[in-house]
Amino acid sequence: MLTAEDKKLIQAIWDKVQGHQEDFGAEALQRMFITYPTTKTYFPHFDLSPGSDQVRSHGKKVVNALGNAVKSMDNLSQALSELSNLHAYNLRVDPVNFKLLSQCFQVVLAVHLGKEYTPEVHSAFDKFLSAVAAVLAEKYR
């Protein structure tokens, strides 16, 4: 459960993500593809080379979806319902991949935000992204 302080930290850091959605998202996806190469199987029609338009576009979609989740921290299930349906029923993405991408996104935040990505921010974001991953996996049950 996110505390009021967690929510405050998440919102403050998210304000710094604004304007960098495409870059941060593409970098997180690239890190995931390199670190967990089996995740590439969900993107057979993509040019997965670094900086490709498809990876950048999808990265932006991912980060924008996280932005919507930040705006709806108190009602993640409703905010992510359509996305959960899409990944569970249409794309059939193994839910473990949500956690893998979450880890990669946190690395991107730490790299770009440096000292601002404090242990407290890391903890808050970890809880938030774990909650997002859990909601996205709800439809699999």
UniProtKB/Swiss-Prot annotation:
Q: Cite the SUPFAM superfamilies for this sequence.
A: Globin-like
Its transmembrane ranges are none
One Pfam family hit: Globin
- Domain Globin, first and last residues per copy: 1-141
Q: What tissues contain this protein?
A: Red blood cells.
The UniProt record gives the binding positions of heme b as H58, H87
Q: Name one GO biological process term.
A: hydrogen peroxide catabolic process
Q: What is this protein called?
A: Hemoglobin subunit alpha-D
Task: Write out the GO cellular component annotations.
Answer: blood microparticle; haptoglobin-hemoglobin complex; hemoglobin complex
What is the purpose of this protein?
Involved in oxygen transport from the lung to the various peripheral tissues.
Q: Family, per the entry?
A: Belongs to the globin family.
Alphabetically ordered keywords of this record: Heme, Iron, Metal-binding, Oxygen transport, Transport
Q: Which organism is it from?
A: Accipiter gentilis
- List the molecular function annotations (GO) for this entry: haptoglobin binding; heme binding; metal ion binding; organic acid binding; oxygen binding; oxygen carrier activity; peroxidase activity
Gene transcribed to yield this protein:
HBAD
Assembly, in brief, is: Heterotetramer of two alpha-D chains and two beta chains.
